[in-house]
Amino acid sequence: EIGSGLVGSEMCIRDRATVVAKAKAANMPNDNIKRTIDKALGSGNTDNYESVTYEGYGPCGVAVIVEALTDNRQRTAPEIRHYFDKYGKGMGAQGCVSWSFDRKGVIVIDNEDEELDEDTVMMDALDAGAADFQPEEGCFTVYTDPDDINTVAKALEDKGYKFDSAQIEMVPQSYQKLDKQEDRDNMEKMLDLFEEDDDVQNVWHNWDQEE
């Protein structure tokens, strides 16, 4: 299972409440929930939508996982393949890169104003059942077992913490740098194409973007 946790299952979209309930149960981000609602219900469409996953390689073999929500695989698959072929090293078989990712719950706690104490947040997160904790610029990232994310998020929310995001993610086991500007540009262009595609819900990759 990748991203929202709906891979391999069909979502029979009947009404707005059904869409929201299914998306929230899958920990889908709010912007993706809106996109899903707009796509599925904008024209009164009640077709079955299916969550499918594609795997492939960006420039220099960067590992990429794409999660899409589609009512027509024959439309979506060629488009995703085209993006991989145009700016990367092509789309691969199922499982070709997912082995190098771990499925985790990821909660990002806002600390833009730097008012939160790192030790306090870490202890609260671990007490709530978090598996790992990482301080970062402007935020703290809390990692959980996928099955524990709702419990941990609720405990932290009850303590007054505000989240930038809380969802299931595919976290790379290692990251890859792109040394050439051309490769970095092509990777950006490929990610932009995925972002602009209405069928695409999530994109995970192991590109180390810190230069």
Give, region by region, the residue ranges found by the protein language model.
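Single conserved hydrophobic/aromatic residue that forms the stacking wall/gate
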Residues: E1-G8, I13
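Residue-level signature of catalytic and energy-coupling elements of molecular machines
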Residues: G8, N27, I33, I80, ...
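Flexible hinge/switch segments at interdomain interfaces of large molecular machines
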Residues: E10, R14-R16, S51-P59, M91-D102, ...
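Translation machinery proteins
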Residues: R14-V64
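Helix N-cap / loop-to-helix initiation motif
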Residues: N27-N32, R73-T76, D117
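A general structural motif
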Residues: T46-D47, F84-G92, D113-M123
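RNA pseudouridine synthases
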Residues: E55-L69, T76-R103
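Positively charged, low-complexity, intrinsically disordered RNA-binding extensions
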Residues: V106-E211
